[in-house]
Curated annotation (Swiss-Prot):
Residue span(s) of domain Ig-like C2-type: 48-149, 174-260
Record organism: Drosophila melanogaster (Fruit fly)
Encoding gene (name): ImpL2
Gene Ontology BP term (one): response to insect
Full protein name: Neural/ectodermal development factor IMP-L2
Keywords noted in UniProt: Cell adhesion, Developmental protein, Disulfide bond, Immunoglobulin domain, Repeat, Secreted, Signal
Amino acid sequence: MEAKMNLHVCALALLLFGSIATVRGRAVDLVDDSNDVDNSIEAEEEKPRNRAFEADWLKFTKTPPTKLQQADGATIEIVCEMMGSQVPSIQWVVGHLPRSELDDLDSNQVAEEAPSAIVRVRSSHIIDHVLSEARTYTCVGRTGSKTIYASTVVHPPRSSRLTPEKTYPGAQKPRIIYTEKTHLDLMGSNIQLPCRVHARPRAEITWLNNENKEIVQGHRHRVLANGDLLISEIKWEDMGNYKCIARNVVGKDTADTFVYPVLNEED
């Protein structure tokens, strides 16, 4: 019970901090800054399963804008952030789907088995071609029995010299499109910190540890083939900021994840 209380207190503190902190999104062309409407939707909650938490929970910490206007030749990045129990997953749906289909949509990601975790995850969708028509992009988040989602309608350029729907030519700098901002879990747990990248040519990924030193493969720290960082049996000394760095010939991008090991009072 004390372990659950520790995790919930940490989560509430992080949510409060996130709600008052100024979050700066990446620049996209002609964002509709006048729109302050909450466009998120939360599905009906099912009966929770018997796990370390009394119920699943999932909340947006950053919802995508309701609409964007694409400029000729501009790459757009739509950002979505949420925080919840276990390890929430985010996927993007292109095109309009009714609520019933969004609720029943099968996730294209393998759920990470982490019943004691509390995680804040960030995902972005890249549009690197000229749209031919207005299109809806929906950020769908899940954890356990909870599903939430929010949509953005992107309008095409008013006039374009480029061929619609054709990917922009040439190399593209890396953009980290899937990462975790914060990861809390009980000491002794194995955690996997994602770092998924959109780049052309393919980006090389390195990680810096909580002492700002490059991580060398070892028995407790491993960089996986997909760029994720696996930390086995986390300890109190693992607490701190971990940085993913993605590089290619065009440039680089970075993303930080704060790891917080929580004492399990039941041990």
